[in-house]
Structure formats: structure tokens, C-alpha cells
């Protein structure tokens, strides 16, 4: 019943998300802050449940059934998180989001926290997708294939680094969410740079 819960993002990757800025080095910004996109997926059970040998490529210990049970009991899964989940920075600084787990994640700026873009997870959690789940054309994909914007622009696959440039981090509070695992939140508070 829940076999396709995490499948959709991997199809998006295969269809052209590889064009995302990856493993970017430090820019000329005064400082770069690091956030890790973490999970603890156990590859054998996740890959079998999702019928996808690349659904989980990490070395975690949480089985697929344990993850679903935690999701149903707690509304989240332990160790699926952004670390840190709160950050204070100054204008002109950047953020690098590093995929250190075994699953595909997004680090998508949202107006408000809410449901993600995976129907099965939203159904389990009784959530409504955030507006940022609106599909966009996948670059390089045939036949007008579309995917949620975050899967295309804000992807953080395992072992990949997404850079959030200083230009997107204006003064104020910015909310970021994984559009696959919607309990993964981060808040970034940006203050004006010191002169």
C-alpha cells in the first residue's frame, strides 16, 4: 500500500534534475553556512519496498516498515531532519545544503510549512500540499514532463550539495521544507550585514 511513498522524487531525478547546481564551492560571499539534509534509511528494506534499487543509497538503520510506523505514530520519522534547523546569518552570506543521508530531499523555500508533494505521505499525515508543489517543466525532459519546482530547482540528492545564493536570502525569516518529507523544516533568519 505504501510502496510508492518515496518513489516520485527519484523519477524526477532520472528525468533531468541532474542539471541542478551540485557540489558548488564557496562563492565570494563573506561566509558560507552548512546545513545537512539527514536521514537514516536502511537500503535493503527501502529499495525492496519501493521496487527501486536507488531509492536509498545510504548506510542507515531505519527500515522502511519502521519509518512508516514512526510516521503514523509521531507524524515524523526520527533522523530525517535538517541540521541545524535554525540558522541566523547576515545578508551577503550563503548556505550550502549537503545531502548526507541515503534518500533524495529538497530544500525548498515555502511561504508556510505544510504538506509536501508526495500524495501518499500527505494522506498518511492528513496534510495539504504547499503551493510550492505546483509542477514546472523538467529541463531536458521529453514530452512536457513536469515535476514540483522543488524537485527541479532545490534538489539535495545523496552526496550532493545545493547552494542557496546570497541573493535569495534577503533580510527577514525564510522557511525551508523538504517537499518529500514535509516534517523536515528549517528557519533561516537573515539580518543586515555589518558595515
Whereabouts are the PLM-identified features?
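Bacterial N-terminal signal peptides that target proteins for export
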Residues: 1-8
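Bacterial N-terminal signal peptides
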Residues: 8-18
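Extracytoplasmic copper-binding redox domains, predominantly the cupredoxin/blue-copper superfamily
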Residues: 19-195
Amino acid at each position: 500500500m505504501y510502496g510508492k511513498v518515496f518513489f516520485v522524487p527519484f523519477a524526477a531525478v532520472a528525468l533531468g534534475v541532474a542539471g541542478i547546481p551540485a557540489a558548488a564551492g564557496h562563492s565570494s560571499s563573506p561566509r558560507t553556512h552548512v546545513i545537512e539534509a539527514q536521514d537514516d534509511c536502511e537500503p535493503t528494506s527501502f529499495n525492496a519496498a519501493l521496487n527501486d534499487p536507488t531509492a536509498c543509497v545510504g548506510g542507515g538503520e531505519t527500515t522502511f516498515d519502521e519509518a512508516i510506523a514512526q510516521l503514523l505514530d509521531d507524524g515524523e520519522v526520527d533522523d530525517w531532519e535538517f541540521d541545524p534547523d535554525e540558522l541566523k546569518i547576515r545578508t551577503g552570506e550563503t548556505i550550502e545544503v549537503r545531502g548526507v543521508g541515503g534518500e533524495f530531499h529538497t530544500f525548498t523555500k515555502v511561504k508556510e510549512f505544510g504538506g509536501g508533494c508526495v500524495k501518499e505521505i500527505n494522506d498518511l499525515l492528513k496534510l495539504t500540499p504547499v503551493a510550492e508543489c505546483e509542477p514546472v517543466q523538467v529541463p531536458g525532459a521529453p514530452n512536457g514532463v513536469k515535476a514540483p519546482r522543488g524537485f527541479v530547482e532545490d534538489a539535495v540528492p545523496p552526496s550532493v550539495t545545493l547552494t542557496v545564493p546570497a541573493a535569495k536570502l534577503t533580510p527577514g525569516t525564510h522557511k525551508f521544507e523538504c517537499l518529500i518529507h514535509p516534517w523536515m523544516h528549517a528557519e533561516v533568519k537573515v539580518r543586515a550585514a555589518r558595515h
